[in-house]
Curated annotation (Swiss-Prot):
Cellular component GO terms, alphabetical: cytoplasm
Subcellular location: Cytoplasm
Gene field: ipgA
UniProt cross-references to Gene3D superfamilies, sorted A to Z: 3.30.1460.10
Protein name: Chaperone protein IpgA
Disulfide bonds: none
Source organism of this protein record: Shigella flexneri
Function: Molecular chaperone required for IcsB stabilization and secretion.
Subunit comment: Interacts with IcsB.
Keywords assigned by UniProt, alphabetized: Chaperone, Cytoplasm, Plasmid, Virulence
Other known facts: The icsB gene can be read-through into the ipgA gene to create a translational fusion protein. The biological significance of this process is unclear.
């Protein structure tokens, strides 16, 4: 685990990360958007909840729309929309390799990830409504 990355996060945001036995810590960005930070030996993996509903299994949204949106997010921000296998929840993910990531870049990346989550939620919400 890369302590200096998380110390900087705490310094900037006041968010202290408590990692569980799966090397996962949970944080609320802007006090409303849940994000899981998974710390692997080589990388940090971000997972943000987009929708609590089963968008695909309940036929709420056209999968083609999600695939097109996923392409744009991947191309422009390096993020991907995924479906969690156990819960069928729609999430946004992004992987950062530690050897290329400074503490300041982690903070910047979290802000960009938050922007992508908001952008994706707005897009999905407009498509559903």
């Amino acid at each position: 685990m890369c302590r200096k990355l998380y110390d900087k996060l705490y310094e900037i945001t006041g968010a202290k990360l408590d990692f569980n036995d799966k090397n996962q810590a949970f944080i609320l960005l802007e006090e409303q958007i849940p994000v899981c930070i998974t710390d692997n030996d080589e990388y940090i993996f971000l997972t943000g909840l987009l929708n609590e509903h089963e968008l695909f299994t309940e036929n709420i949204i056209n999968p083609e729309h999600i695939l097109i949106l996923n392409y744009s997010l991947s191309r422009d921000y390096g993020s991907s929309i995924c479906l969690l296998p156990d819960t069928h929840q729609c999430v946004l993910t992004k992987k950062h390799y530690k050897k290329y990531l400074s503490p300041d870049e982690l903070i910047e990346s979290l802000y960009e990830f938050l922007f992508c989550i908001k952008l994706t939620i707005a897009n999905i919400t407009s498509e559903v409504n």
